[in-house]
Amino acid sequence: MKPESSVIFFPCKDIEETKAYYTEVLGLPIYKDLGATVWFDCGYGYLAFVNYGPDRALATGQCISFNLPSTEDVDRMYEKIQALPVIGLKGAPQKHPRFPVYSFFFSDPNGYTLEYQKPLD
């Protein structure tokens, strides 16, 4: 049976700060808000954050990537992000030296690496 969608859960430091960042800065709509858990609609699946409390470690080594339709869209998103209160903007969009994508990276308030990318043919 084929799943109808997918959701990936990440622990977060502060659910309200995370919710504000992903809605106000990145513009992702909330799909479900369950108090200590919030799901964001990414258009092709869901990204969720959970406040497990202070004893739960955050995930490490992950990159949350959002695919855009074109390299021009990546450039436009970079211009938007550059003007906003983002954390750890890691440079302008470029072709990745190892993978066939055009992208840029930055961090969310939890320290997770975020990427906007366009896969290249």
Give, region by region, the residue ranges found by the protein language model:
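Short, conserved charged micro-motifs
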Residues: 17-18, 71-77
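N-terminal beta-strand motif that seeds the catalytic metal site of vicinal oxygen chelate
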Residues: 1-16, 64-66, 120-121
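Vicinal oxygen chelate
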Residues: 79, 84-121
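Short secondary-structure junctions
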Residues: 27-34, 87-92
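Amphipathic alpha-helical segments
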Residues: 16-29
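Short amphipathic alpha-helices in soluble, non-transmembrane regions
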Residues: 23-25, 77-82
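Short beta-strand micro-motifs in enzyme catalytic cores
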Residues: 38, 62-64, 100-104
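Conserved short beta-strand elements that form part of the metal-binding/catalytic scaffold
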Residues: 29-62, 113-118
